UniProtKB/Swiss-Prot annotation:
Domain of life: Archaea
Entry keyword annotation includes S-adenosyl-L-methionine: yes
Cofactor entry: [4Fe-4S] cluster
A GO biological process held by the record: biotin biosynthetic process
One family name in Pfam for this protein: Radical_SAM
InterPro entries named among the record's database cross-references: Aldolase_TIM, BATS_dom, Biotin_synth/BioAB, Elp3/MiaA/NifB-like_rSAM, HcgA-like, rSAM
Metal-binding recorded as keyword: yes
GO molecular function: 2 iron, 2 sulfur cluster binding; 4 iron, 4 sulfur cluster binding; biotin synthase activity; metal ion binding
Family annotation (CDD domains): Radical_SAM (cd01335)
Protein name in the entry: Uncharacterized protein MJ0785
Length: 375
């Protein structure tokens, strides 16, 4: 079906004429495919315009922002991806621990708390269950201290027994050799979130890590021509200027295929348990601005950070992937990295479809799954 351009009638408030410029540039792109590469390279906004959009503070401007970001998403992404999760181990050797972490053993009784390491059989059963639910993509995450060996182990098992697309996330705990090994076994995406590029803030909330180590891993992923996922953790004390600088660092210094936008959500028992939660609206705004900078990439919202019941905020903002979605047949008790609550598959699918969007699923498998596990 031909994509038709519609200019919204929402009134532009204040001096944010940036919306008019965005509308005109998007219209120009749609009417002239010859400018595709230039459009992708430059996006729809620059640093100053991004900062103006971060400072919007009324419903009219929010609606306008979400409208254009969603239309850009819909042009490039015809379906909304759904990514499930396998947590391989929470035995983390980072010391001292990240101040917000509720994933690592011993950090929060709301999280896993007790140490675990999945067996090969548990990884296999989890992957098969995820594929049988109709989900087509999985994230395999590991704590630090293994030089990538744990995610390599998981990748080999998942690829052997399923056709799932695989993202692995071990943060900075990857060497050049482990990245080469991941490529050898067919990795689709490697995630290494920078979280913030404000070095002082990074060191404050992640005292056991160095930002340089995460940047090094991102550059190695680019070096070996593997899709790179790297995102922002927002609401941890960064400024809007920090977010803009971070997004344009990704734009100008790295080749990024996926950006997760993760809002801070406090875990009880951690040093940041009393730090305010990042609202779903703030996350949606950040997603929308990211979409205008990166028109065609996968922008991800994990259900534990947006809030499992608030996924539609992320979709309003132009997200194209909902992550940490857990089917009822998953054999493990999965808890979110930013929040113990995760998204239920059937509920996430309904939230996507209620907005007139199409989930990316193996529908035959999903329908069979519903016959067994549906309400």
């Amino acid at each position: 079906m031909k994509y038709t351009y519609k200019i919204s009638k929402v009134k532009i408030s204040g001096d944010l004429m940036v919306f008019g410029k965005i509308e005109e540039e998007f219209k120009e792109f749609l009417e002239s495919r010859r400018k595709y590469n230039e459009f992708i390279k430059n996006g729809l906004i620059d640093e100053d315009e991004a900062l103006k959009l971060f400072k919007i503070d009324n419903w009219r401007d929010y609606l306008k922002l979400f409208d254009i970001a969603s239309r850009v998403r819909d042009y490039f992404k015809k379906k909304i991806e759904i990514t499930s999760t396998i947590h391989i181990t929470n035995i983390c050797h980072v010391n001292p621990k990240c101040l917000y972490c509720g994933f690592a053993a011993g950090t929060s009784k709301e999280g896993y708390y007790e140490p675990f390491r999945l067996t090969d059989e548990e990884i296999k059963k989890s992957a098969i269950a995820i594929e049988e639910s109709g989900i087509k993509r999985v994230s395999c995450s590991s704590a630090h201290g293994y030089q990538g060996k744990e995610v390599i182990r998981a990748l080999k098992i998942v690829k052997k027994y399923t056709n799932l697309e695989v993202l692995v996330n071990a943060g900075a705990d990857l060497t050049e050799e482990s990245i080469k090994e991941l490529k050898k076994y067919g990795i689709d995406t490697i995630c290494c979130n920078l979280e913030t590029i404000n070095e002082n803030l990074f060191k404050k909330v992640k005292p056991g890590e160095e930002l340089e180590d995460r940047i090094r891993v991102c550059k190695l992923v680019n070096k070996y021509d593997i899709e790179l996922s790297t995102g922002l953790l927002i609401g941890i004390g960064e400024s809007y200027e920090d977010r803009v600088e971070h997004l344009f660092y990704l734009k100008n210094e790295l080749n990024v295929g996926e950006i997760p936008i993760m809002g801070f959500n406090p875990y009880k028992g951690t040093p940041m348990e009393n730090h305010p939660k990042c609202s779903a609206l703030e996350q949606a705004k950040t997603i929308a601005i990211t979409r205008l900078i990166f028109p065609n990439i996968r922008i991800t919202s994990p259900t534990p950070t947006i809030g499992a019941e608030l996924v539609q905020f992320a979709l309003f903002g132009g997200a194209s992937n909902v992550a940490t979605v857990i089917p009822k047949n998953h054999p493990m008790n999965v808890k979110g990295v930013g929040n113990p609550k995760t998204g239920n598959l059937e509920e996430v699918v309904k939230m996507i479809m209620d907005l007139g969007l199409k989930p990316k699923l193996d529908w035959r498998r999903y329908e069979n799954y519903l016959k067994i596990y549906g309400k």
